[in-house]
Amino acid sequence: MIHVMIDEFTPCLKDAKTGELVQTEVVRIKRRSFLKKYNKKNGWYTDWEKLAEENEIYAVVIEGTVDIQGLVAIAPHKDMRSMYISWMCTAPQNNKFMTKSIKYYGVGGHLFAIVADKSMQWGYEGALHGFAASEELLRHYVEMFHAEHLGMLHQYQFFVDEAHAKELLEVYHYEWNET
């Protein structure tokens, strides 16, 4: 389920108060124990520790820190030749559904760019798909990056093709840290 609004397309994250661009890293989280504190109780929509069983988990962090700004759980989907987004959400302080005072802009687009990047690495040319959490979010993804509404497996299922996914990759810049 995807609970992310795309507020701005920025090459990094943008501090909502100062407008300053903040450099980021993408970190793959392999230790389930680390994910325990990212759960429904504290605004992360699901228990991320459980998602690590069948997915690769990636976090957008401020460069040089473990200050997580968003999480995404993905898995390759060979039948659809795309990456499947199992879950995606921003940190509560970046979630416009939870706070009026956002800390960083650009987290949502950043998370989608990570998925497109991993799709490229898997040989799927950037294609990705998943289930939006609501009709409002589905319409938002159609508008923001020309997602196609599929609605086959879920009423808000969508697909982003290779060309539109590559447009995301042209915007976002980050360092990978998969250690």
Language model: regions and residue ranges:
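Non-catalytic substrate-recognition and accessory regions of acyl/acetyltransferase enzymes
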Residues: 1-102, 110, 117-129, 136, ...
